[in-house]
């Protein structure tokens, strides 16, 4: 989905050279068509639905995680996620125990411990819990790896450059990093946990299939920190979904890094350094 029905994402890497710029090189492409972000030397945050297949009740395995990917170029290597004890995952239990379609959206949050220390070369982002005002009034960004063969309800997978007609429907470059030309807005906080922290918020960062699991991040004291995870679009996903329109200001949703989820990240970083 795209806010105001205009896709303003731009290519964030060369077509042939890996994404070397900081902090974009910390953002991972998943070969199972998701995104994630390194928040430790071998620790990444993503969406629960990128890690756990609810209909089959199985963890996803066999896919590759590639930081800073640009097509067939991966300057920082990649890590294959095997089955067995070499990989550690986390999703809230409520996500895995819910209906076949997956748990409520507020539980769509996942942590992945990679078998390889990719972050030693790329570095990694921080992670933080911001207040509602901190998210609403701050500069929030999203970068991810769109699945170029996936289309919206109008049969279009749009990636528009800044100067292009917003309805031109340009074809994107597969397995490359994209993001809005500027920061995006956030609001509509909902699904409070037991401590009163809203676990979901809506946002205007343009995204499509493949962006799932990508970080919503902000700069705190000059350093990038993950403050949420993009999980879904609220319009325009399928032919039966409501269409995105020019009045769709924040048509996408993210799971927030609450104090509870932040504690889980710290736990896995300490337990599996």
Give short role names for the model-derived ranges:
Residues 1-40, 259-273:
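Protease-domain processing segments flanking chymotrypsin-fold serine proteases, especially trypsin-like
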Residues 19-23, 38-39, 56-59, 89, ...:
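Extracellular/periplasmic catalytic domains that process cell-envelope and extracellular macromolecules
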Residues 2-25, 52, 58-120:
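Conserved catalytic-core segment of clan PA serine endopeptidases
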Residues 37-38, 206-230:
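Catalytic nucleophile loop of clan PA
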Residues 50-52, 69-73, 116-119, 146-148, ...:
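Acidic glycine-/aspartate-rich tracts in secreted/extracellular proteins
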Residues 231-273:
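C-terminal cap/linker of serine protease catalytic domains
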Residues 105-207:
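Chymotrypsin/trypsin-fold serine protease catalytic domain
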Residues 22-64, 68-69, 218, 232:
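Catalytic histidine site
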């Amino acid at each position: 989905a795209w806010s105001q029905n205009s896709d303003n994402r731009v290519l964030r890497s060369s077509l042939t050279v890996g994404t070397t710029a900081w902090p974009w090189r910390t953002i991972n492409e998943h070969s199972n068509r998701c995104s994630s972000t390194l928040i430790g030397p071998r620790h990444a945050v993503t969406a629960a639905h990128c890690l756990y297949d609810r209909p089959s009740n199985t963890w996803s395995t066999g896919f590759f995680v590639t930081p800073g990917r640009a097509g067939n170029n991966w300057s920082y290597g990649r890590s294959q996620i095997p089955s067995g004890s070499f990989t550690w995952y986390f999703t809230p239990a409520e996500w895995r125990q819910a209906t076949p379609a997956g748990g409520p959206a507020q539980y769509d949050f996942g942590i992945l411990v990679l078998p390889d220390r990719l972050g030693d070369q790329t570095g990694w982002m921080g992670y933080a819990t911001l207040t509602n005002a901190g998210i609403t009034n701050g500069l929030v960004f999203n970068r991810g790896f769109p699945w170029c063969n996936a289309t919206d309800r109008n049969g279009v997978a749009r990636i528009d450059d800044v100067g292009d007609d917003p309805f031109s429907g340009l074809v994107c470059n597969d397995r490359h990093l994209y993001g809005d030309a500027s920061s995006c807005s956030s609001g509509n906080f909902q699904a409070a946990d037991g401590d009163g922290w809203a676990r979901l918020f809506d946002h205007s960062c343009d995204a499509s299939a493949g962006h799932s699991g990508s970080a919503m991040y902000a700069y705190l004291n000059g350093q990038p920190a993950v403050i949420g995870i993009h999980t879904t679009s609220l319009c325009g996903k399928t032919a039966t979904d409501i269409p995105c329109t020019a009045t769709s200001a924040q048509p996408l949703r993210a799971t927030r890094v609450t104090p509870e989820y932040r504690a889980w990240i710290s736990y896995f970083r300490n337990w599996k350094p």
